[in-house]
Amino acid sequence: MALQPESPGQPASTVDPAEIAKFSKLSAEWWDPTGRMAPLHRINPLRISFIRDAACRKFERNAKSLSCLEGLRMLDIGCGAGLLCEPFTRLGAQVIGIDPSATNIAAAKLHADKSHLAIDYRNVMVEEIDPRERFDIVLAMEVIEHVTDVGAFLSRCAALMKPTGIMVVATLNRNWKSFALAIVGAEYVMRWLPRGTHQWDKFVTPAELEQHLNRLKLIVTEQSGLVFNPLADRWKLSPDMDVNYMMVAEAAP
């Protein structure tokens, strides 16, 4: 998406500079660790390490290697502006990031271009991915609480996994604690998220998620909660899955 200088014999660029400016502003917001996306930036290192370590255990890689995911195909569903796509590309994975928001994809492409990273970003829904495409790692991070049919969505995700692949899902538990912290606390008190970002009745309990996965002949191999410590102002992995949690699933033997 970079603008090229006009030269004799070269047609003028058809890219609208105003659009570039708009996408640049959005990209800066997504990637500003102190701005509106600060909560996501705080939790992102934990998501990255959890996914990386799970993948390295599955595929017998050295998690300390800077190219530990080399040769692995990864699909990030609902990728936003690429906060997961970029670090996993740097670790060697061949990453495809998809998002139904054209604006998010434009911002993601712009930031990847500035970072000199080759990432295949697509403005599509998971249902539009060619079923012949298969991936070693399928990510559905903070997505299922926004879909209309969790079972159908996960079925489509599972269909895109290689037989030896893994799926990593992150979402929010459904209980009064998650209502108090993820909605009242995050959206109304702390104002980390715009009001209305989440609907509590669309949250998914760990038992429900595991049931969906089991119906698809997948088994949960790893799971972890993510807990925020307000005194330390940081997130940590925890056995406590009352609010935020992640699961790794693979094909049942």
Curated annotation (Swiss-Prot):
Taxonomic lineage: Bacteria, Pseudomonadati, Pseudomonadota, Alphaproteobacteria, Hyphomicrobiales
EC number: 2.1.1.222, 2.1.1.64
Protein function: O-methyltransferase that catalyzes the 2 O-methylation steps in the ubiquinone biosynthetic pathway.
Similarity comment text for this entry: Belongs to the methyltransferase superfamily. UbiG/COQ3 family.
Protein name (Swiss-Prot/TrEMBL): Ubiquinone biosynthesis O-methyltransferase
Entry annotated with the keyword Metal-binding: no
Tagged with keyword Methyltransferase: yes
Keyword annotations of the record: Methyltransferase, S-adenosyl-L-methionine, Transferase, Ubiquinone biosynthesis
Gene: ubiG
Record-level Gene Ontology MF annotations: 2-polyprenyl-6-hydroxyphenol methylase activity; 3-demethylubiquinol 3-O-methyltransferase activity; polyprenyldihydroxybenzoate methyltransferase activity
Catalyses which reaction(s): a 3-demethylubiquinol + S-adenosyl-L-methionine = a ubiquinol + S-adenosyl-L-homocysteine + H(+); a 3-(all-trans-polyprenyl)benzene-1,2-diol + S-adenosyl-L-methionine = a 2-methoxy-6-(all-trans-polyprenyl)phenol + S-adenosyl-L-homocysteine + H(+)
Pathway: Cofactor biosynthesis; ubiquinone biosynthesis
Signal peptide: none
NCBIfam families xref list: UbiG (TIGR01983)
Annotated S-adenosyl-L-methionine binding sites: 47, 78, 99, 141
Domain of life, source organism: Bacteria
Any one Gene Ontology BP term: methylation
Pfam families: Methyltransf_23
Root EC class: transferase
Organism whose genome encodes this protein: Rhodopseudomonas palustris (strain TIE-1)
